[in-house]
């Protein structure tokens, strides 16, 4: 019975598959790595005021755009299927550093 429920959920996962050339909108996965679940997101300006980006020197090339995700962990397809989805903010981040402690270039997405 559980196997058949998992098979029924596959079309929903196909809707969340990456779309070639598409942006990071609702129902789309990350092109730069796994979708992240972040306990907090903030603007780059706020993160700089709080000194959160000082340790990233040399890691991020170019200007930082988007949001900064804090205390993030990757979301797996299995986690979504079993109901262990994100209860905070789901984001797609360009640069994941310090094992998800600080992620930069994040864009909120819906699963």
Curated annotation (Swiss-Prot):
Name this polypeptide is given: Class I hydrophobin SC4
Subunit structure, interactors included: Self-assembles to form functional amyloid fibrils called rodlets. Self-assembly into fibrillar rodlets occurs spontaneously at hydrophobic:hydrophilic interfaces and the rodlets further associate laterally to form amphipathic monolayers.
Cellular localisation: Secreted; Secreted, Cell wall
One Gene Ontology cellular component: extracellular region
Residues carrying sugar: 39
Keyword Disulfide bond applies: yes
Description of what induces expression: Expression is regulated by the mating-type genes in the secondary mycelium, and especially activated by both the MATA- and MATB-controlled pathways.
Organism this protein belongs to: Schizophyllum commune (Split gill fungus)
Keywords for this protein: Cell wall, Disulfide bond, Fruiting body, Glycoprotein, Secreted, Signal
Disruption-associated phenotype: Does not affect the formation of aerial structures but leads to gas channels in fruiting bodies that are easily filled with water.
Source species taxonomy: Eukaryota, Fungi, Dikarya, Basidiomycota, Agaricomycotina
GO MF term (any one): structural constituent of cell wall
